[in-house]
Regions:
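Boundary/entry segment of secreted carbohydrate-active catalytic domains
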Residues: 1-22
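C-terminal helical cap(s) of enzyme catalytic domains, especially alpha/beta-barrels
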Residues: 264-298
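Acidic (Asp/Glu)-rich catalytic clusters
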Residues: 20-26, 44-66, 80-98, 134-139, ...
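Acidic/histidine-rich catalytic cores of soluble enzymes
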Residues: 137-224
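Active-site beta-loop-alpha junctions enriched in small/polar residues
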Residues: 11-15, 33-37, 69-73, 105, ...
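Gly/Pro-rich active-site loop or hairpin
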Residues: 41-46, 78-79, 118-126, 187-250, ...
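Hydrophobic faces of well-ordered beta-strands that scaffold small-molecule active sites
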Residues: 6-12, 28-32, 64-68, 100-102, ...
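Active-site acidic/histidine proton-transfer and metal-coordination neighborhood
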Residues: 81-176
Length: 311
């Protein structure tokens, strides 16, 4: 499957809509959270009525990428009964997305804490997940990329490392990797003492299967580091971006901001300051991309700085 080389973009998060000027930015791509815009499974509409205007504006402005958190992609319900098949697949086709990324957790009630509940890193689960991933990619008709998750503990029964599990799943499924660099950083903070290694992770995964990258920030709370997307990107994650861009050729780097402001606890929302911080991160990501691939390599700069042919 072909993957377009786009550049640097943002995730179109509902918590920012209304005060962050998405449509005024020279974005190379916009990532849409399918879970946030889809209509309920027990209703008649594909798109939630409250999201219709938002989606219409986005579709006409940028190349779109899809993202699934709660599609039940890797759970145990019949795949064709999941939100992924019933809502995310038709949304992907309607939006004309270049690819879809999904989170590597169960998201179907298998664990009580869905967000921080990783898949079981085992050979048996790699085979089961790969079969579902291959079938889901066929339904989408575009590349499906799996996002490495931030997690607080591994699933009981795991007999592989996270990176070994991902590499085996990709080998068996023929799907792709959506590399979240902040999730790598978060896991290293929380599990480094027990042997988690970013260097080993990057040396093990098939770098040629990376088609997109996530960048975000987070913070320490009560002795654990959390992937909250509520700060600017940490310096160590910028260093990881430079390293990965030197070793792989993704189609896009997407920045994520999930809370209403990048501010200290208890502070009042300052949209002007927060907008400036997000724009500063965007510009820094563009600079990293341009250092790696050249100033004419992004979608918004190719016509301005000549053509570019990926290797």
């Amino acid at each position: 499957m072909s993957v377009p080389r786009l550049g640097v973009g943002l995730q179109y998060n509902p918590e920012l809509i209304g005060w962050f000027p998405f449509l005024d930015q020279p974005l190379d791509a916009l990532e849409v959270l399918f879970d946030s815009v889809m209509g309920p499974l027990d209703g008649p509409g594909l798109i939630s009525p409250r999201s219709a205007d938002i989606v219409r504006d986005a579709v006409g402005s940028f190349p779109l990428l899809g993202h699934s958190n709660y599609g039940g992609d890797f759970g145990f319900d019949d795949l064709l009964s999941t939100a992924a098949a019933l809502r995310h697949v038709p949304l992907a086709k309607q939006f004309g997305v270049s690819w879809v990324a999904d989170h590597c957790f169960y998201s179907d009630g298998s664990w009580s804490d869905v967000w921080s509940s990783p898949l079981q890193f085992s050979r048996a689960e790699a085979a089961r997940v790969a079969a579902r991933a291959r079938a889901l990619q066929d339904l989408y008709g575009v590349p499906l990329a799996h996002e490495n998750a931030a997690y607080y503990r591994t699933c009981p029964g795991s007999d592989l490392s996270e990176e070994e599990f991902l590499a085996l799943t990709l080998e068996l499924s023929g799907t792709y990797l959506h590399l979240d660099l902040h999730n790598l950083y978060a896991n290293a903070q929380n599990h480094g003492a027990s042997g988690y290694s970013i260097e080993r992770f990057l040396d093990t995964i098939p770098l040629e299967r990376i088609i997109s990258i996530h960048m975000a920030g987070g913070r320490w709370i009560d002795g654990q580091y959390h992937d909250l997307h509520d700060t600017q990107v940490p310096e160590a994650v910028w260093d990881l971006l430079d390293e990965v861009l030197s070793r792989a050729q993704p189609g896009a780097v997407i920045l994520e901001y999930e809370t209403q402001a990048l501010h200290a606890d208890g502070a009042t929302l300052d949209t002007e300051r927060t907008t400036d911080l997000i724009l500063a991160d965007l510009e820094r990501a563009r600079q990293a991309w341009d250092r790696a691939y050249g100033p004419g390599s992004r979608r918004t700069t190719r016509d301005k700085v000549g053509s570019w042919t990926p290797s």
